[in-house]
């Protein structure tokens, strides 16, 4: 006989799956165990006990056995004796019924009558119970075995248990308690449109966060050790981070379908149908389980009798078991019907964390759907605490807190100080690249002046940025930064320069337009779409103190808002990435402009609107499509113009009107196709910087000597063969770039350039260097750019002096 304890194997599932079993599944499993016991008990009795006990019947009335042999004396027809050839003779004394059958004949009669005359329900009752119970068990546990559902269930249970036991769950919730116990008001994060949402502080921590009711500790007494609740070690942090990733991937995968829900529904429907079927036929056939059974079989030739009276020894017990079984099936069926009603009444393919959002500080926990929602509903039937603790790993706020903790552990103050550098403006700069957020230790660098954030998604600027009293410049490269209200208040008063680079319009935080004291704004990104231009550019009207505006994009025309802002702009720079920029007449309104840059705007002529900007001091038309600059004559009206950059164009000649720009100090004409320099150029007596490199020049006019203020001359990459002696009358020359020409010799008068600190000679046809180079007192070896073998043609004392000058500087 099978031990009762072994029957649990048929009903038990994996222990981990127990949390997916609601109370009704637990009840039905135990009912199934009892049904199995009934089946095994009944089957065991049938195997071990006599199935049927039969005796021949000597007194037969109408093919039925008379219950008493005295019936033959009763009035009426005389009984027949079909089962015997021996006629009874009256006996005056007591007598018994004797049969002349041996044991084998009795066994044979028992077997034949059991097989042919006992009702099938009484015969197979234990096996029917076993069959139906196994079907019930299969229906109840099929979803745990079916590959398409078992994989999801196994993965879900594994993640759920890890989330429940994770140290981050307890510590994150403990931080919630601390935050809600803090009397200081909480500031809500501002979104792109700077909507402010007030946040309230709860007084009853335990009531606000019921998730912690089972884990009461020192927090319950108002004592919180921040080192325990706020810091995770590296291993715990990595484990929690991995859990967040697993939950995200699992949610994406499971929410795609509802196969678990549909399979569970079908299992329940099958069990209800099975219940109805069992009740119908069992109640109908249970009365066929009888103790007395008349058996009429045609075996008279073997035993001498045809009619027998048989007893079914197990009938009474089977009837009791059948009644008990029917009651169990009814109870089982009612539970199944309740399950079906529960599934049909409730929307189980949607799960809302509304109550948890209200109870905790994690108001961003999303609702879930399909199989994910259904499994959470089942978990709630087991213990709602599981879903409440699991919700922590669905919250982006919680993930950001964990990310911040891990970030703080990785980026210590010493490590950040090692990353500090000095930029070109001699400002102390920190560049953070591809991090998950801003380490809190950054705000301990009180000496920081420039903060660069690049490729940092979903970063939030906290109020602690107010500690950076020296911060004046902020870079946001592909970083959609949010900001808290106190931080915005600080930046509004202190930030002077802002650089933003984006590929998607969503990467531009709209709170930047509330920076009332902002003086310099750099925007780099695609503004080709009309709506993008409106959203991004239109907010510039709010920046009343803006002085410098740089746009690197692909505009087809100058937006009106730029013109409106231009009333107080001092510098406007547009790098149009090669897209043709038209309709520049609105530039006339920017009367206060001192610097104008129109770079890569595909300009073919110098825009006439520029000539109305009388305050211009610097014009940069780099990398356009300029072929002629006849309009340069109009520059004479720009009396303050000191710098003109016409580099990287296709200019073939310089108009003689260039001489009218008498205030010009810097002129960039490099990377063009100029073949000749007009004498009028040298009327610009104030020129200090002249760049004519990478052109087609073959000589320098002797009038170059008129530029007595010239400090830097670049004629690199031309075809110049000789240098005019007048060049060396420019005694203020500090840098002379002569590389990649066809110079045969360097005049000895080079020694007259007493201010020379750098001379480039590489790439010429020089055979030797003049000794007079040693007469340039400020020239060092590092400032002499020449081939090594050519340098070795100098006398040893000259070389020694140049080397010594380098060492003294070092």
Curated annotation (Swiss-Prot):
Location relative to the cell: Cell membrane; Lysosome membrane
PTM comment: N-glycosylated.
Membrane topology designation: Multi-pass membrane protein
Site (Required for anion selectivity) residue list: 103
Keywords: Acetylation, Cell membrane, Chromosomal rearrangement, Differentiation, Disulfide bond, Glycoprotein, Ion channel, Ion transport, Leucine-rich repeat, Lysosome, Membrane, Phosphoprotein, Repeat, Spermatogenesis, Transmembrane, Transmembrane helix, Transport
MF term (GO), any: cyclic-GMP-AMP transmembrane transporter activity
Regulation: Inhibited by (4-[(2-butyl-6,7-dichloro-2-cyclopentyl-2,3-dihydro-1-oxo-1H-inden-5-yl)oxy]butanoic acid), which plugs the channel like a cork in a bottle by binding in the extracellular selectivity filter and sterically occluding ion conduction. Lipids may block conduction in closed heterohexameric channels.
Modified residues (Phosphoserine): 202, 217
Motif (Di-leucine motif): 706-707
The organism's place on the tree of life at top rank: Eukaryota
Disease implicated: Agammaglobulinemia 5, autosomal dominant: A primary immunodeficiency characterized by profoundly low or absent serum antibodies and low or absent circulating B-cells due to an early block of B-cell development. Affected individuals develop severe infections in the first years of life.
Protein's job: Essential component of the volume-regulated anion channel (VRAC, also named VSOAC channel), an anion channel required to maintain a constant cell volume in response to extracellular or intracellular osmotic changes. The VRAC channel conducts iodide better than chloride and can also conduct organic osmolytes like taurine. Mediates efflux of amino acids, such as aspartate and glutamate, in response to osmotic stress. LRRC8A and LRRC8D are required for the uptake of the drug cisplatin.
Family of this protein: Belongs to the LRRC8 family.
Summary of subunit composition and partner proteins: Heterohexamer; oligomerizes with other LRRC8 proteins (LRRC8B, LRRC8C, LRRC8D and/or LRRC8E) to form a heterohexamer. Can form homohexamers in vitro, but these have lower conductance than heterohexamers. In vivo, the subunit composition may depend primarily on expression levels, and heterooligomeric channels containing various proportions of the different LRRC8 proteins may coexist. Interact with GRB2. Interacts with NOX4; this interaction prevents the ubiquitin-mediated degradation of LRRC8A.
Protein name in UniProt: Volume-regulated anion channel subunit LRRC8A
Gene this chain is encoded by: LRRC8A
């Amino acid at each position: 006989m099978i031990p009762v304890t072994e029957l649990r194997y048929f009903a038990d599932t994996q222990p981990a799956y127990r949390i997916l079993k609601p109370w009704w599944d637990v009840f039905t499993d135990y009912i199934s165990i009892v049904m199995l016991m009934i089946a095994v008990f009944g089957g065991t009795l049938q195997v071990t006990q006599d199935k049927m006990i039969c005796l021949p019947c000597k007194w037969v009335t109408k093919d039925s056995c008379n219950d008493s042999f005295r019936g033959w004396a009763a009035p009426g027809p005389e009984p027949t004796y079909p089962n015997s050839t021996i006629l009874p003779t009256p006996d005056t004394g007591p007598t018994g019924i004797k049969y002349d059958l041996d044991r084998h004949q009795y066994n044979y009669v028992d077997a034949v009558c059991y097989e042919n005359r006992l009702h099938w329900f009484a015969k197979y009752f234990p096996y029917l119970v076993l069959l139906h119970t196994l079907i019930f068990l299969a229906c109840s546990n099929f979803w745990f075995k079916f590959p398409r559902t078992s994989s999801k269930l196994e993965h879900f249970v594994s993640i759920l248990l890890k989330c429940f036991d994770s140290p981050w769950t307890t510590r994150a919730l403990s931080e919630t308690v601390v935050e809600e116990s803090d009397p200081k008001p909480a500031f809500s994060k501002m979104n792109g449109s700077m909507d402010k949402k007030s946040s309230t502080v709860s007084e009853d921590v335990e009531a606000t966060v019921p998730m912690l009711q089972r884990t009461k500790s020192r927090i319950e007494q108002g004592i919180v050790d921040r080192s325990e609740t706020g810091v995770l070690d590296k291993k715990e942090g990595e484990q929690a981070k991995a859990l967040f990733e697993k939950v995200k991937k699992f949610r994406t995968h499971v929410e795609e379908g509802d196969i678990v829900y549909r399979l569970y529904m079908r299992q329940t429907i099958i069990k209800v149908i099975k219940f109805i079927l069992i009740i119908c036929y069992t109640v109908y056939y249970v009365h066929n389980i009888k103790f007395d059974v008349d058996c009429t079989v045609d075996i008279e030739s073997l035993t001498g009798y045809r009619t027998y009276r048989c007893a079914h020894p197990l009938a009474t017990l089977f009837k009791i078991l059948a009644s008990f079984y029917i009651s169990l099936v009814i109870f089982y069926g009612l539970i199944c019907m309740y399950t079906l009603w529960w599934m049909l009444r409730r929307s189980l393919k949607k799960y809302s964390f509304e109550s948890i959002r209200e109870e905790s500080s994690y108001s961003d926990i999303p609702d879930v759907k399909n199989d994910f929602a259904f499994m959470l509903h089942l978990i709630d039937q087991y213990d709602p605490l599981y879903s409440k603790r699991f919700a922590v790993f669905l919250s982006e706020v919680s993930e950001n807190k964990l990310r911040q903790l891990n970030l703080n552990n990785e980026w210590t103050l010493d490590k950040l100080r090692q990353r500090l550098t000095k930029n070109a403006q001699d400002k102390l700069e920190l560049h953070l690249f591809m991090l998950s957020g801003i380490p809190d230790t950054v705000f301990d660098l009180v000496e920081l002046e420039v903060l660069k954030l690049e490729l940092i998604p979903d970063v939030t600027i906290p109020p602690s940025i107010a500690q950076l009293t020296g911060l004046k410049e902020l870079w946001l490269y592909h970083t959609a930064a949010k900001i808290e209200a106190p931080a915005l208040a600080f930046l509004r008063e202190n930030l002077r320069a802002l650089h933003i680079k984006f590929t998607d319009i969503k990467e531009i935080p709209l709170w930047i337009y509330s920076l009332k004291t902002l003086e310099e704004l750099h925007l780099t990104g695609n503004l080709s779409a009309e709506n993008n231009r409106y959203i991004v550019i239109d907010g510039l009207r709010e920046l009343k103190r803006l002085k410098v505006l740089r746009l690197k994009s692909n505009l087809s025309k100058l937006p009106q808002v730029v013109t409106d802002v231009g009333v107080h702009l001092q510098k406007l720079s547009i790098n149009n990435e090669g897209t043709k920029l038209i309709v520049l007449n609105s530039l006339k309104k920017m009367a206060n402009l001192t610097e104008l840059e129109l770079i890569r705007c595909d300009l073919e002529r110098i825009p006439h609107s520029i000539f109305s900007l009388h305050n211009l001091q610097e014009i940069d038309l780099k990398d356009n499509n300029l072929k002629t600059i006849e309009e340069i004559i109009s520059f004479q009206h720009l009396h303050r113009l000191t710098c003109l950059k016409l580099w990287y164009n296709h200019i073939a000649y310089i108009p003689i009107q260039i001489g009218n720009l008498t205030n010009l100090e810097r002129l960039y004409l490099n990377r063009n196709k100029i073949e000749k320099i007009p004498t009028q150029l040298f009327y610009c007596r104030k020129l200090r910087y002249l760049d004519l490199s990478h052109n087609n020049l073959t000589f320098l006019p002797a009038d170059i000597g008129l530029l007595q203020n010239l400090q830097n001359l670049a004629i690199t990459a031309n075809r110049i063969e000789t240098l005019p002696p007048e060049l060396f009358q420019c005694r203020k020359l500090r840098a002379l770039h002569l590389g990649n020409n066809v110079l045969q010799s360097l005049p000895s008068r080079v020694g007259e350039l007493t201010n020379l600190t750098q001379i480039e000679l590489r790439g010429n046809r020089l055979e030797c260097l003049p000794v007079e180079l040693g007469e340039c007192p400020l020239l060092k070896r590092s400032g002499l750019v020449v081939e090594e073998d050519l340098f070795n043609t100098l006398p040893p004392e000259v070389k020694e002096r140049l080397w010594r000058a380098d060492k003294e500087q070092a």
